[in-house]
């Protein structure tokens, strides 16, 4: 059984609690809880999603409203509270599965289980670009497919799935994932997450999230109007077959508490 309302899409959680460390802070969240920036000088501001999933296949999008200096990260976090992250330590790094950017020309693709903060080692791979695309910047839409049952992730930019060395990604056909990980090691709930750094004297990065509620990203671009295979969502680009919008209608619910199945 699945929950009835399709209107409850994942947003960014303004009520998320700061961690105990100064490098575990919730950023500023605006525009219907979909737009985020750090708001904390010389720190990453983190924004986690309201919906977590342990299993399934999910499609999400991020829009780079402002490509700030020096870095940002989008993806998923294994855990239910923001963790310590400053870009130079290994604490909690293994709990991220993400695409990130650090000033220069590199995309970083990081799977669950990575503990490296140095590009090119321990599965943290730097790419001057995907071999078929450039580094994403202001005005670009980042696409992501996650298969939490198989431990695979795909990333793309502006409607084109990235090639990180083995051919262009093809999530619909389970081909050429950009990232893989051991499912059993990260079996608990995962939440979408966005990180932005704010640095004095530089442009601050701003990113807008779309779990299927608004393909215009709060009016920043023209609508896409693409739904998932169940008919839910409004995405800029079409979700690959089998990958769903992160909304209540696509989340399983036990018959024991489903109003449609109980007598109460």
Question: At which residue positions do the language-model features occur?
Answer:
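PRY/SPRY (B30.2) beta-sandwich protein-interaction domains
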Residues: 1-264
């Amino acid at each position: 059984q699945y929950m009835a309302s399709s209107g409850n899409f994942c947003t960014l959680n303004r009520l998320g609690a700061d961690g105990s460390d100064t490098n575990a802070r919730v950023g500023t969240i605006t525009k219907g809880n979909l737009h985020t920036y750090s708001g904390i000088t010389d720190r990453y501001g983190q924004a986690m999603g309201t919906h977590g999933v342990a299993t399934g296949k999910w499609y999400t999008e991020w829009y780079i409203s402002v490509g700030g200096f020096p870095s940002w990260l989008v993806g998923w976090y294994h855990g239910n509270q923001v963790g310590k992250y400053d870009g130079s330590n290994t604490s909690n790094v293994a709990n991220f599965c993400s695409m990130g950017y650090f000033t220069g020309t590199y995309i970083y693709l990081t799977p669950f289980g990575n503990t490296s903060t140095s590009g090119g080692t321990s599965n943290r791979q730097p790419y001057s670009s995907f071999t078929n695309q450039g580094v994403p910047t202001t005005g670009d839409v980042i696409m992501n497919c996650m298969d939490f049952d198989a431990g695979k992730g795909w990333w793309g930019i502006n409607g084109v799935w990235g090639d990180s060395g083995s051919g262009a990604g093809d999530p619909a056909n389970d081909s050429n994932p950009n990232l893989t990980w051991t499912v059993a090691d990260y079996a608990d709930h995962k939440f979408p997450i966005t990180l932005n750094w704010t640095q004095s004297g530089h442009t601050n990065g701003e990113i807008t999230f779309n779990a299927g509620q608004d393909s215009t990203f709060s009016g920043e671009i023209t609508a896409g109007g693409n739904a998932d295979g169940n008919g839910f969502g409004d995405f800029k680009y079409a979700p690959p077959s089998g990958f769903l919008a992160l909304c209540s209608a696509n989340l399983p619910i036990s018959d024991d508490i489903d109003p449609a199945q109980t007598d109460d």
